[in-house]
């Protein structure tokens, strides 16, 4: 399984892809390692966790994106993302997350995608705005967002 955009490959995190990312010096955090362990128990969760974002031109891992679990009973999933700082402000996050959102809606299992970001994370806020996500509410530190299937793009 692999998603593809004009500039990127987006691949689910597996033991093999973790090894490749680590060889490049990419810090695969506990969310990735935990996801791979979950996949060992239940292969159905593979697409509903972490994915690496790889630049086509040189096969460099730029960051990771993904969902925080399978869709719930209300067909809602939460998306998250993080990129190496030197790849910020180049459109990679927007391009990758848009592809993942499109994929999720095409599965038929998802009606709503939510996200949260720190109030002062202006780069992340801009990504969510470019994805046409709508602000739902906020706490003292976090802003909550969503996009519904019939409203994407």
Where are these regions (language model features)?
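GNAT-family acyltransferases
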Residues: 1-78, 83-86, 99-103, 107, ...
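Conserved beta-strand-loop-alpha-helix junction that forms the acyl-donor binding cleft
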Residues: 115-125
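Conserved acetyl-CoA-binding loop-helix of GNAT-fold acetyltransferases
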Residues: 89-104, 125-130
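Short acidic/polar active-site loop segments enriched in Thr and Asp
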Residues: 111
């Amino acid at each position: 399984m692999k998603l593809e955009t004009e500039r990127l490959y987006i691949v689910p995190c597996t033991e093999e892809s973790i090894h490749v990312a680590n060889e490049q010096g990419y810090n695969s955090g506990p969310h990735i390692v935990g996801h791979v362990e979950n996949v060992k128990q239940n292969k159905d969760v593979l697409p509903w966790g972490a994915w690496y974002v790889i630049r086509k031109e040189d096969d460099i891992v730029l960051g990771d994106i993904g969902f925080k679990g399978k869709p719930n009973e209300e067909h809602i999933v939460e998306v998250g993302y993080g990129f190496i700082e030197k790849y910020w402000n180049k459109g990679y996050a927007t391009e990758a997350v848009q592809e993942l959102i499109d994929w999720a809606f095409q599965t038929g299992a998802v009606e709503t995608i939510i996200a949260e970001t720190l109030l002062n994370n202006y780069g992340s806020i801009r990504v969510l705005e470019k994805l046409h996500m709508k602000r739902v509410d906020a706490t003292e530190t976090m802003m909550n967002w969503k996009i519904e299937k019939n409203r994407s793009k």
